[in-house]
Design a protein with these regions (language model features):
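RNA-contacting regions in translation and RNA-metabolism proteins
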Residues: 1-50, 62-63, 67-95
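Glycine-centered tight-turn and secondary-structure capping sites
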Residues: 54-58
Length: 95
């Protein structure tokens, strides 16, 4: 039960940070994929906003991952961040 609450909080944290950065906050989605040792948070944003979330030389994405890492230490559970983009129709784009 506590793990679910932590996971929801982490998803909300990533979503709020991303929404503050992008032009299309409605398109921001965060999906959690639980694994044995860690949880992967998949952040999906509109194609036009991917650069804003990644940032110059990946600095923004690295900063988001650093925050996740710091919170992960407190929760004793590893969270990682994957940044995905959608095409104009809202489907995952082929990378």
């Amino acid at each position: 039960m506590m793990q679910d609450t932590n996971q929801d909080n982490m998803q909300q944290l990533v979503a709020e940070i991303a929404k503050a950065l992008v032009d299309d906050p409605q398109a921001v989605e965060v999906q959690a994929v639980a694994r044995d040792e860690n949880t992967v948070l998949r952040l999906r944003v509109a194609s036009a906003d991917v650069g804003k979330v990644i940032g110059k030389q990946g600095r923004t994405a690295r900063s988001m991952r650093t925050i996740l890492s710091a919170v992960s230490m407190k929760l004793h559970h590893r969270y990682t961040l994957d940044i995905l983009e959608e095409d104009e129709a809202g489907r995952p784009a082929d990378s």
